[in-house]
């Protein structure tokens, strides 16, 4: 009976510090869509919510991971140029350098506004969000149409000018910034929604559309995007597709390989590949769009996307739960799959080190479970169409989990502000790490039972020299392993690498779950792919990009870039 009363508190009252906004004004308040992109519609006993946003651009709360948004940080962040990487990379001597004739030619294509030579603008475009990778490009082009991208690439290919496609520049592996002086092709001006079918839910848009803007458009139509990222306020759909971004909804809706129906891509020689199909079924030969999904702009530049979007469901619930150990987190996941079934839409976890960093380095955040300290925290979201049905299933799940001793404490968000606060803890971890100083980031896929083993072994290895943080998408086996230190140190890096890659390979994991390879992991691809597979990938690269001008030095080992 005591357990039932505890569960009832968790469902009806929650943690007083979290739910009593009069007594706790430190929690962030926002209106509009949550991090997951859904409008939270709670049953009446749990509170009401405005069901519709008339002007989404005016009222939408944005969580942005852009350098502009995060420019003012509490701690200085070390900048690290490519030349200071452990493995030196040589510029491919066959690539030409920009001259005045090239610039004049680009101005004829784009006009004055589409050719950017301003040093301050280029300074931002040359550096990644983490301020870890820095290139030296002297030119950024901003095409506004497919034809303009085609003409740009045709000229660059004829002159052997290397280029790097860039969207929101929110990547974490150095994939969207130049290594040397590559021409930056920024697709942000190509941001039109071309069509949307309200019956099928199929959206066709240009590559420069910001993910959150697409979510806002779809929200009015009664749909949502099938992916959600912490960087949604800055990242662009073309970059999402080219990196096969995963995010918070993969557990429910799967990867972009399953949701993207078609793409338009421009080959290095300027050829426009129109694969912008809107059919769920098309079994006519090779499905070439999959070559470009996850290719990180190395085979062609994606300019348009056709994507299947699911309906926005009205009943959404969010739990923030505590666990004493990682074994309980695993059992809780199994219990959630069994008890919640198809309404389970997110299952995220973070360890106590991650929580401590967020509380210390992210402004406006407080612990929703302040009464005790726990080793792990789990964020669970359910999404369905029947509030009563979903609430009953959630109650059953929570009661069973508490009776089993899996969750000693937890809260259920009672309104959108509380849910936003919980999501902000999880999504704010990258910003908190950035504010804390230097950070070494590893995005790994592992068997779920092995994820915390790597975190613990890394802590043993590094001891007190750095803080080892473990968090991620537990529901799909994606660990975000982060090592936080006061500054970048090659001696520390030598203790992390290649250990983390060898450990991952030994346990049949992947060294990149969703961030891609970029520059950071190009020379590490052999930890996840056989030599035969890498050779075949190189053959595809040679076929589509014989001059190697598209995003060089990325994905494939640097030796290949020089030899090509």
Regions found by a protein language model. Give the residues of each.
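Noncatalytic alpha-helical scaffold of FAD-dependent oxidoreductases
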Residues: 2-564
